[in-house]
Amino acid sequence: MTVKPELNEITPYLQFNRQEWGNFRKDTPLTLTESDLDKLQGQIEIVSLKEVTEIYLPLSRLLSFYVTARQTLQQATYQFLGKPEPKVPYIIGIAGSVAVGKSTTSRVLKALLSRWPDHPNVEVITTDGFLYSNAKLEKQGLMKRKGFPESYDMPSLLRVLNAIKSGQRNVRIPVYSHHYYDIVRGQYEIVDQPDIVILEGLNILQTGVRKTLQQLQVFVSDFFDFSLFVDAQAQVIQKWYIDRVLSFWRTTFKDPHSYFHYLTQMSETEAAAFAKHVWNEINKVNLMENILPYKNRAQLILEKAADHSIQKVYLRKI
């Protein structure tokens, strides 16, 4: 284990390289096969069994300890009260930029955590479902701010998190379609008292100025039991974003019903230039203003290299 405070300053994080972090796997068995892993891959990010073994297995072991400890604490509370209360899920928040690999991280963690005996029921929720509809964003002049904090129906997201954390059953989650680039009206996914909820989103660690004591403001991160930030250099993420757009340009965008079908009328060079423009004018701005400044609020940071491999792990001391 190495602890390397930057600029000789005291840091709340412990820093580990791949080998050091991988040692924390101990005797945790690898429960995923190559076939399982194929189903979890992202559009441009390929996660190897080596990555799972060295990074995600130790992380799932740590999280399993945390979840079990929280369950034990809940049981102590129930024993004190003398009656059982509704099961309260453990909520993990995963934040980071567009195209940094949040969805892949969420899927891999769900697969691993659901194989631990004490918490087999794991659900993933994305904040995409809480974006305002395109019609509303157009009306408010916010289409070019899609993904920024003001483009989300935050009251609805907070109500859903409150319901989940209160142990409510059959909580409805709005469905978002990346194919249509919009909310799917009338469609919902149901979250019914899982053991763990993984919430994935861009701005979920963001806070604002607290209101007066009479009007206390609640933030999304207030509901988290654990938070994780997926990090990489901005220039690296830009390349990943362009690669992702081009991957869709070659495949799903060819569907005439796709929102971005018009991009297929462009050459590959033009499509890449379009993606770079969107990155510079929208996604990079959002990263610098609303995502990156809150990185150090996370309890764990996964730092990626240009090949998508995680090279460093930062774990908050407490």
From Swiss-Prot:
It is an enzyme of class 2 (transferase). Pathway: Cofactor biosynthesis; coenzyme A biosynthesis; CoA from (R)-pantothenate: step 1/5. ATP binds at residues 96-103. Pfam families: PRK (PF00485). One of its GO terms (cellular component) is cytoplasm. It catalyses: (R)-pantothenate + ATP = (R)-4'-phosphopantothenate + ADP + H(+). It is found in: Cytoplasm. Keywords: ATP-binding, Coenzyme A biosynthesis, Cytoplasm, Kinase, Nucleotide-binding, Transferase. GO terms for molecular function: ATP binding; pantothenate kinase activity. It comes from the Bacteria. One of its GO terms (biological process) is coenzyme A biosynthetic process. PANTHER family: URIDINE KINASE (PTHR10285). HAMAP family: Pantothen_kinase_1. Belongs to the prokaryotic pantothenate kinase family. This is Pantothenate kinase.
